[in-house]
Amino acid sequence: MTQEAMSVPLGCDGMRCFSGHEIAGRRSSTCRSGFVFPTPWVLDSYKRGHFFRAVYEANCYAVRANLEAIKADSESPLYVCGGQTASDFYNGILADVCGRQVITQKEREITGLGIAMGAFTGVGLYKDIREAAAEMSFAGKIYEPKHDCQAFYEDWLEKY
C-alpha cells in the first residue's frame, strides 16, 4: 500500500478523500464523505496508489484539524504513536501537512508501555505517571516538514 502511494505525487493528481464535509476545520457545501475527483473523465488515469495516498493525506488533514481545534502550540513538535506512525511515509506527510516536527516513539508497542507505566506507578516504583513516562519512554525518529511540500498542502487547504 505505502509503496504504491509513494509513486503518486502530492495532491494525488487532484483526487481527494474526505471523511465528511470538513477538512482541517474548513467546511465545504459541495463535498460529502468519499473520494472526489477533479473531473469525471480522468478516472481511468487513477491507480490504487492514488486512493492510498488520498487516504494518507486525509488522515493527516484530520490530525491538523484536531490540533487547530484544541489550539495546540504550532511551534511544539507533534509526538505520535501507534498504527500509521510505523510508516515513514505517513509521518513525512503528517509533518508537511501540520507544518511541524513529528516525533515517533522508540517503543512500537505503546499500549503495553502505557500499561506498564501505570502498573509501576501503582505499586510505587514511580511517584506519578509523569515520572514513569520520563524514565520509560524515548523518542524515536524525527520528521521535519519539507518547505515545498508544506507550501503545497497549505495552498491546497486555502483553495478548499
Task: Please state what every model-predicted region is.
Residues 19-23, 37, 115, 131, ...:
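Generic structural "secondary-structure junction" signal
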Residues 28, 67, 122-130:
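Short helix-capping/linker segments at secondary-structure and domain boundaries
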Residues 124-160:
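Acidic, glycine/GT-rich loop-and beta-edge segments that sit at the periphery of enzyme/chaperone cores
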